[in-house]
């Protein structure tokens, strides 16, 4: 079977990708684990070199990546640049520079006299193979940030992007290819989210990141409980904006309109409620 990526603004086909044969998931997992062992043996500095190659690719092809996101997802080119492409480049930069500080071994003082002659150290070990099921509303920046975090922590990654935006998944593949990673360390999977999630759990995924709806999140958490698989679920938000009496109302109203309607309102951090101090309420509403 094939999955067709449709431009929501024009109805034109953007790309057509073959669905991944999930019968091959055991073999995919084996390749990921073999690559992960090789990758985990690298230092943070060595991993960062690969991430830097990805950052350069993103910067050099920023316009092309923004166009792919815009055509696949429907958001404007400027939104695609600002909320998708730029965050990916920034993520590469920050995690490459800081992962060693955050995840490196940390010494701890003895908490009891009995352990005064002991040395205590906290070590953050890789999980192994991390699965990611990402949403359509931010099809590049959300999964890519999770990918970079997982890689810098020494993990392999299996990615399943939203069924509505497979062209962006292919673009992510190209970014990862630019990183010159070990074969099998990153794999892009095309198909149904529920079927892929089941295949992940059945084949021993070590952690799952999911961004999507509350009902889907509940289903995944119930599945994960059967194997005690750790999950990280981001299931939307109900975000408030607060406007105080001393606020610049022109700036506040512009910000409120953008935050509420950017990406057609399909944003987990979009403004859905506004609390305005009584003294400026009428003026704020009129401006808005």
What are these regions (language model features)?
Residues 155, 160-162, 190, 211-212, ...:
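Short beta->alpha connector loops at strand-helix junctions that form conserved
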Residues 11, 47, 92, 154, ...:
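Residue-level signal for inorganic ion chemistry
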Residues 106-183, 228, 250:
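Conserved small-residue-rich beta-alpha loop and adjacent elements
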Residues 148, 207-211:
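Periplasmic-binding protein-like
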Residues 1-118:
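N-terminal Rossmann-like NAD(P)+-binding subdomain of aldehyde/semialdehyde dehydrogenases
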Residues 119-120, 187-206:
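A structured beta-alpha segment of the ubiquitous adenosine-cofactor-binding alpha/beta core
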Residues 207, 215-288:
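ALDH superfamily catalytic-core signature
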């Amino acid at each position: 079977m094939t999955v067709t990526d449709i431009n929501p603004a024009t109805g034109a086909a953007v790309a057509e990708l073959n669905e991944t044969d999930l019968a091959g998931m055991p073999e995919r997992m084996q390749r990921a684990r073999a690559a992960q062992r090789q990758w985990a043996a690298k230092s943070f500095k060595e991993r960062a070199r690969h991430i830097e190659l990805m950052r350069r690719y993103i910067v050099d092809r920023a316009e092309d990546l923004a166009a792919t996101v815009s055509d696949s997802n429907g958001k404007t080119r400027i939104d695609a640049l600002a909320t998708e492409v730029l965050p990916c480049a920034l993520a590469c930069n920050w995690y490459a520079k800081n992962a060693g500080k955050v995840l490196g071994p940390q010494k701890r003082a003895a908490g009891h006299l009995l352990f005064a002659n002991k040395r205590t150290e906290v070590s953050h070990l890789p999980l192994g193979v991390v699965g990611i099921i990402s949403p359509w509303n931010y099809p590049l920046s959300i999964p890519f940030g999770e990918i970079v975090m997982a890689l810098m922590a020494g993990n392999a990654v299996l990615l399943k992007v939203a069924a509505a935006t497979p062209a962006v998944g292919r673009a992510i593949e190209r970014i990862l290819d630019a990183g010159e990673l070990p074969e099998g360390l990153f794999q892009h999977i095309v198909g149904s989210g529920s079927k892929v999630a089941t295949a992940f759990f059945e084949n021993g995924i070590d952690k799952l990141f999911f961004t999507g709806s509350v009902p889907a999140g509940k289903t995944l958490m119930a599945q994960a409980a059967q194997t005690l698989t750790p999950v990280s679920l981001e299931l939307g938000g109900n975000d408030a904006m607060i406007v105080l009496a001393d606020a610049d109302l022109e700036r506040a109203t512009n910000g409120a309109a953008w935050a509420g309607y950017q990406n057609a309102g399909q944003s987990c951090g979009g403004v859905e409620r506004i609390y305005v101090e009584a003294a400026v309420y009428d003026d704020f509403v009129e401006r808005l």
